[in-house]
Amino acid sequence: FVAGAGFLTMAAVMYGIRVPHIEPGATGNPARNLLEGLDYIRTNFLFIFLIGMTFFNSFFGMAYVSLMPVIAKDALSLGPGAYGILLSAGGVGSLLVTVVFGFAGNPQYKGLLIIGGAVLFGISLVAFGLTAELIGSYGLAIALLFIMGLFTSTYMISIQSSLQMMVPDSMRGRVMGFYGMTWSLMPLGAMPAAGLAVLIGAPFAIGVGGIAVAAFALLA
């Protein structure tokens, strides 16, 4: 109910926003426009890195969400109420960073924020999986999820704002379309994560996702 009310509120706010008319940058065949957007991304390594980073975040990094019920039940022995609090810790961290970015405007050193945030998110994800398995501390799990929320929002907000500012108006819709498509990969990432969890356990499967995100940020 609360989630539904939140979406209705957001819809009402969006409906009240008035923006000036902008001429469409793409006309004609949608498939051709899609290919043009892909070709534009391929011409710039920075755009490849930024879109690739969002892919790794959605497919590997955020796969931990699908494994959280297993962590809560088997590793932390939590009930529904404690599980809800655990999940909200990451949201609080993300919200805090979003508010800070809102007041900070356009921060410098976005490259450092992107790479550093992704690496630290990956490390935090590995730490969360390992400590849940080896220690089983509820308080520590909350703290690590809060930290993960801080870092993931740090680099994802930096990626989104960088794309918005760097891509010209004529291509922005198509490039941001690919950015949005990467978020749709999150449910697909749950499938290999679940398969890996069967083989090595959910905590270690979560750690593998964190390693993948950090490795891409450092090696790409």
Regions found by a protein language model. Name each.
Residues 6-23, 219-220:
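C-terminal membrane-cytosol helix-exit motif in multi-pass small-molecule transporters
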Residues 17, 42-43, 61, 73:
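Residues at helix-coil transition
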